[in-house]
Amino acid sequence: MTVERLENGVIVQRNTNEIEISITLDTVHGKLEGSTGVNFFDHLLNTFCHYSGLGLRVSTCESKDGILHHLIEDFGISLGLAFRELFDYTKVRRFGEATVPMNEALVGCYVDLSGRPFFQKNFEFSVEKIEDMPVEGFEEFMCGFVNHARITVHFFKFFGKNDHHISESAMKSFGLAIAKALESSEKKTTKGVID
């Protein structure tokens, strides 16, 4: 894995026996450019970019073994590492939360840019795939992102039956919570450092 710093962004390249990924995460564009090859995953990523205000350019996203689980998990790893490299958690608000309705679904997201990776959600999906994406990919992506960004993320589903609506409500709330957590702040952690 290689990391290259830019003025307003970070390029991460990850090449394993299973996948090849090259992405750029920036603070400028606020949208997804390019494709992972998984339409619904692209939809969720674009949703995250729109509501977080972050830009994501996918230059390369190829599966060498044809297993979507690996592709989506490694994409989360790459994006999480880019996020950690791009931001100094000691100079931002750190905490963010948002609750977003989408039709019958209502999901809240609670974020701490703590340096301590932890992911939790209180819901499971009722189908095996949403459009062309295996539902296990949602958690695999989030775990990859959280572990390498070194942040804490909780999702709480208040209501929801339609898995498309639930996942999109979750990703919108995640984007908004991240945007809030990244607001500039002079308030320091009581510990004095974020590892």
From Swiss-Prot:
It is found in: Cytoplasm. Its EC number is 4.2.1.19. One of its GO terms (biological process) is L-histidine biosynthetic process. One of its GO terms (cellular component) is cytoplasm. Keywords: Amino-acid biosynthesis, Cytoplasm, Histidine biosynthesis, Lyase. It holds the Pfam family IGPD. It comes from the Bacteria. This is Imidazoleglycerol-phosphate dehydratase. It comes from Thermotoga maritima (strain ATCC 43589 / DSM 3109 / JCM 10099 / NBRC 100826 / MSB8).
